[in-house]
Amino acid sequence: MSDTVTTARATARFVRVTPMKARRVIDTIRGKSVEDALAILKYAPQAASEPVAKVVASAAANAENNFGLDPQTLVVSEAYADEGPTMRRFRPRAQGRAFHVRKRTSHITVVVESQKGSAQ
């Protein structure tokens, strides 16, 4: 078994986007090459695509700078959005009522790995 590292990871915590909306974006890039994933995210209409793109770019930079991996061969092997803490707020309504507003946060994690043969 060789000691060469072929994976790198990046995490963005407490991102102000709901996990469900982040997962919708993440599902489109899982298994794609990093270049393809960034191109998809650049033109995706969802608001969650911007923080996900930053995490993908950070994971690719970690792979290149920390482990010396070739950025051309990187593939998004794992990507997931876990639920972070929920901020609870009140929305004033008529006649003294108050509705609850839940401002959800996400922890977005992306793992990239080097495919030695060819990028997808």
Swiss-Prot record:
What this chain does, per the record?
A: This protein binds specifically to 23S rRNA; its binding is stimulated by other ribosomal proteins, e.g. L4, L17, and L20. It is important during the early stages of 50S assembly. It makes multiple contacts with different domains of the 23S rRNA in the assembled 50S subunit and ribosome. The globular domain of the protein is located near the polypeptide exit tunnel on the outside of the subunit, while an extended beta-hairpin is found that lines the wall of the exit tunnel in the center of the 70S ribosome.
The protein's matches in Pfam families, at most eight in alphabetical order, are given as: Ribosomal_L22
Q: Which SUPFAM superfamilies does the UniProt entry name for this protein?
A: Ribosomal protein L22
* PROSITE patterns the record matches: RIBOSOMAL_L22
- InterPro entries reported for this sequence: Ribosomal_uL22, Ribosomal_uL22_bac/chlpt-type, Ribosomal_uL22_bac/org-type, Ribosomal_uL22_CS, Ribosomal_uL22_sf
Query: Would you tell me the Gene Ontology cellular component terms?
Result: cytosolic large ribosomal subunit
Q: Which GO terms describe its biological process?
A: translation
Keywords from UniProt, A to Z, are: Ribonucleoprotein, Ribosomal protein, RNA-binding, rRNA-binding
> A single GO molecular function, which one?
rRNA binding
**Protein name as catalogued:** Large ribosomal subunit protein uL22
